[in-house]
Amino acid sequence: MIPRLLPFFASLLFAALLFPGDIPPGIRNTVCLMQQGHCRLFMCRSGERKGDICSDPWNRCCVPYSVKDRR
């Protein structure tokens, strides 16, 4: 029974290492600042679009419309 479970647990470990999960705290704020944005509570100001979430709960990254997407 153990030899049959070994490949299963090995594949779970591989998946956990391949997809590490969420970004560590504080990094999201830095990413927002690198996009020339500001972390704001709930809503963005006029002339800003809503981006990704920031490290603090409920905060969103607000990026000005003048900054073009680099994708």
From Swiss-Prot:
SUPFAM superfamilies: Defensin-like. Residues 1-19 form the signal peptide. It comes from the Eukaryota. The keyword Signal applies. It is found in: Secreted. Disulfide bonds join 32-61, 39-54, 44-62. InterPro entries: Defensin_beta-like, Sperm_Ag_11A_B. The keyword Signal applies. Belongs to the beta-defensin family. This is Sperm-associated antigen 11A. It comes from Mus musculus.
